[in-house]
């Protein structure tokens, strides 16, 4: 197994009300790929996708095999219904991310939501990571994007986000 410096792991289920999430995931992957390649970071992106009859569309219908290969990304399909869940909680995140973590090759693992975009400061810091450490990074909430996610370009979205910050969370490393 070829070890990577870092595995980026997220979770998704594209069902009613989340039709644009596949395109948000596309931007998420492009953002990671762009910055990791720029900073010479060996990486992989793993997306756990819960699949059942509630899916309106599958991620593989939005992201081509060529796109995934170009950006070192992989879709790992899971079925939430296969996990014991006596209290019937929505367990989308845990089973999906656990399945990805099991398959990950990264020395470090970064768990995020699929609509998170990280800035260059985050990627610059990856080279400083130390084993057996937990890192939490500053996050910003921004206004809703002013264009259609399906046609959004990464550079435009990053610029838009930097100009439309609503609030900031957790300024700690």
Regions found by a protein language model. Give the residues of each.
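Cell-envelope/extracellular polymer assembly enzymes that use nucleotide-activated donors
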Residues: 5-10, 44
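Active-site beta-to-alpha loop of glycosyltransferases that engages the nucleotide-sugar donor
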Residues: 10-27, 51-53
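Short, acidic, metal-binding catalytic loop of nucleotide-sugar glycosyltransferases
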Residues: 25-41
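Short beta-strand/loop segment that forms part of the nucleotide-sugar
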Residues: 41-52, 76-80
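Active-site-proximal specificity loops/subdomain of glycosyltransferases
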Residues: 58-103
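Conserved catalytic core of nucleotide-sugar-dependent glycosyltransferases
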Residues: 101-102, 119-173
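Short aromatic/hydrophobic "clamp" motif used to bind/position activated sugar donors
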Residues: 109
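The conserved acidic donor/metal-binding loop of glycosyltransferases
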Residues: 113-117
């Amino acid at each position: 197994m070829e070890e990577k410096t870092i595995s980026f792991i997220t979770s998704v289920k594209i069902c009613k009300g989340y039709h644009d999430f596949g395109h948000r995931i596309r931007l998420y992957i492009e953002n990671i790929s762009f910055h990791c390649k720029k900073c010479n970071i060996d990486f992989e992106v793993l997306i756990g996708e819960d699949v059942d009859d509630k899916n309106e569309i599958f991620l593989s219908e939005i992201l081509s095999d060529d796109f995934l290969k170009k950006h070192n990304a992989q879709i790992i399909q899971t079925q939430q219904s296969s996990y014991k869940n006596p209290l019937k909680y929505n367990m989308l995140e845990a089973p999906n991310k656990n399945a990805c973590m099991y398959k990950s090759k990264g020395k470090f693992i970064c768990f995020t939501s699929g609509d998170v975009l990280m800035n260059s400061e985050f990627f610059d810091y990856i080279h400083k990571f130390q084993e057996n450490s937990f890192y939490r990074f500053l996050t910003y909430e921004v206004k809703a994007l002013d264009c259609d996610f399906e046609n959004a370009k990464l550079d435009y979205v990053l610029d838009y986000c930097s100009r439309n910050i609503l609030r900031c969370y957790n300024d700690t490393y």
